[in-house]
Design a protein with these regions (language model features):
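Multi-pass alpha-helical transmembrane bundles in non-GPCR membrane proteins
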Residues: 2-238
Length: 238
């Protein structure tokens, strides 16, 4: 009976689920093109990382970058499906999947650095911590009642900036250029949040998702420089 009640709770749309995301057809198309561009670039970027990881790194690098790329593509895919679906009975499930995938993308973005650059307990502890937070976030997003977008945006931002806790191992093991790219990407994501929580902004979703694609692109470059090509840049870190 509890399972049936939970299923009904998860699948029942609320008033916000039945509101169209876009005020005009132009806004809808703009957001679609942003998603198409993001998904295309993420897919190509994932292949590039896989090839270069196989050339310059070992199996660990290949696996870590594959996790990162898959999480990024998963987030963009769920976002595309959810945002472009008209109000319908499936909307609440798609929304939950879209928002849950953000936690996976953030954890996936940490993974190449925590597993391939960090050492000792920092590598183990921080990797376990970010994935524990991610899985907890996914579980909550999939079953919990709706909470305001502003609240969850704050949670995502805090999770993304959790890296400051590991500032010392990052400074010790990550190339300065990659560090700069990580910070820049974080700032882009954070700036985009202010657009997302401002419903009066025209083309809000397209602009917000544009920030997401831009931030993801910068972080892709950070993974390339700081993890995949790190063996060729090792002297610069020392």
């Amino acid at each position: 009976m509890r399972l049936k009640s939970l299923f009904k709770h998860v699948c029942t749309p609320d008033a916000l689920d039945m509101i169209d995301h876009y005020q005009t057809r132009t806004e809808r198309l703009a957001d679609l093109w942003v998603h198409v561009a993001g998904l295309s670039l993420a897919s190509i970027g994932g292949i590039v990382l896989a090839v270069l990881s196989a050339i310059y790194g070992g199996p660990g690098t290949v696996i870590a970058t594959a996790i990162y790329a898959l999480c990024l593509v998963a987030m963009l895919t769920t976002s595309t499906i959810y945002n472009w679906t008209n109000p319908c009975a499936a909307r609440p499930v798609l929304r939950r999947m879209d928002e849950a995938a953000i936690f996976l993308m953030i954890a996936g973005s940490y993974t190449p650095f925590t597993t391939q650059r960090f050492e000792g307990m920092w590598a183990i502890g921080f990797t376990v911590a970010v994935w524990a937070i991610a899985f907890a976030g996914v579980a909550v997003k999939l079953v919990a009642p709706r909470i305001s977008d502003a609240f969850w945006s704050g949670v995502y931002v805090l999770f993304g900036w959790l890296a400051v806790v590991a500032l010392k191992p990052m400074l010790d093991t990550v190339h300065p250029v990659a560090l700069g790219l990580l910070v820049l990407g974080g700032l882009i994501y954070t700036a985009g949040v202010f657009v997302f929580i401002s419903p009066r902004v025209k083309y809000r979703r397209a602009i917000w998702h544009g920030f997401v694609v831009a931030g993801a692109g910068v972080h892709w470059a950070a993974v390339l420089v700081g993890v995949v090509l790190a063996p060729t840049l090792a002297p610069a870190i020392a």
